[in-house]
Design a protein with these regions (language model features):
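C-terminal alpha-helical interaction appendages
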Residues: 1-63
Length: 63
Protein backbone atom coordinates (compact mmCIF):
# COMPACT_ATOMS: atom_id res chain seq x y z
CA UNK A 1 0.00 0.00 0.00
CA UNK A 2 1.17 3.52 -0.76
CA UNK A 3 0.69 6.51 1.50
CA UNK A 4 -1.80 7.94 -1.01
CA UNK A 5 -3.96 4.81 -0.66
CA UNK A 6 -3.75 5.03 3.13
CA UNK A 7 -4.90 8.65 3.00
CA UNK A 8 -7.69 7.72 0.57
CA UNK A 9 -8.96 4.97 2.88
CA UNK A 10 -8.89 7.34 5.85
CA UNK A 11 -10.80 9.93 3.79
CA UNK A 12 -13.39 7.34 2.76
CA UNK A 13 -14.27 6.50 6.37
CA UNK A 14 -13.66 9.61 8.48
CA UNK A 15 -15.56 12.85 7.98
CA UNK A 16 -12.48 14.92 8.90
CA UNK A 17 -9.48 12.86 7.78
CA UNK A 18 -6.93 15.65 8.27
CA UNK A 19 -7.84 16.11 11.92
CA UNK A 20 -8.03 12.35 12.47
CA UNK A 21 -4.55 11.84 11.02
CA UNK A 22 -2.90 14.63 12.98
CA UNK A 23 -4.74 14.59 16.32
CA UNK A 24 -5.88 11.05 17.19
CA UNK A 25 -3.22 9.16 19.15
CA UNK A 26 -3.22 5.40 18.62
CA UNK A 27 -1.96 2.98 21.25
CA UNK A 28 -1.76 0.52 18.33
CA UNK A 29 0.97 2.71 16.80
CA UNK A 30 2.89 3.09 20.03
CA UNK A 31 1.14 6.22 21.25
CA UNK A 32 1.52 8.38 18.14
CA UNK A 33 -0.72 9.73 15.39
CA UNK A 34 -1.10 8.48 11.83
CA UNK A 35 0.95 11.42 10.54
CA UNK A 36 3.72 10.73 13.04
CA UNK A 37 3.75 7.05 12.02
CA UNK A 38 4.15 8.08 8.37
CA UNK A 39 7.03 10.40 9.26
CA UNK A 40 8.60 7.66 11.37
CA UNK A 41 8.58 5.43 8.30
CA UNK A 42 5.95 2.88 9.29
CA UNK A 43 4.52 0.89 6.38
CA UNK A 44 1.15 2.32 5.27
CA UNK A 45 -0.52 -1.10 5.39
CA UNK A 46 0.58 -1.53 9.01
CA UNK A 47 -0.73 1.95 9.84
CA UNK A 48 -4.07 1.05 8.24
CA UNK A 49 -4.27 -2.17 10.26
CA UNK A 50 -3.71 -0.09 13.41
CA UNK A 51 -6.47 2.33 12.37
CA UNK A 52 -8.85 -0.61 11.88
CA UNK A 53 -7.94 -2.07 15.29
CA UNK A 54 -8.46 1.37 16.85
CA UNK A 55 -11.95 1.56 15.30
CA UNK A 56 -13.54 -1.87 15.81
CA UNK A 57 -16.95 -0.54 14.77
CA UNK A 58 -15.65 0.12 11.25
CA UNK A 59 -17.84 -1.73 8.70
CA UNK A 60 -16.16 -4.47 6.69
CA UNK A 61 -16.47 -2.51 3.44
CA UNK A 62 -13.88 -0.04 4.78
CA UNK A 63 -11.45 -2.62 6.16
Amino acid sequence: MRISELRSRISDYFSDPVTYSQDIVHAELGGITVNQAIIRGDEPDEIWKAVVRHNPEMPDKFR
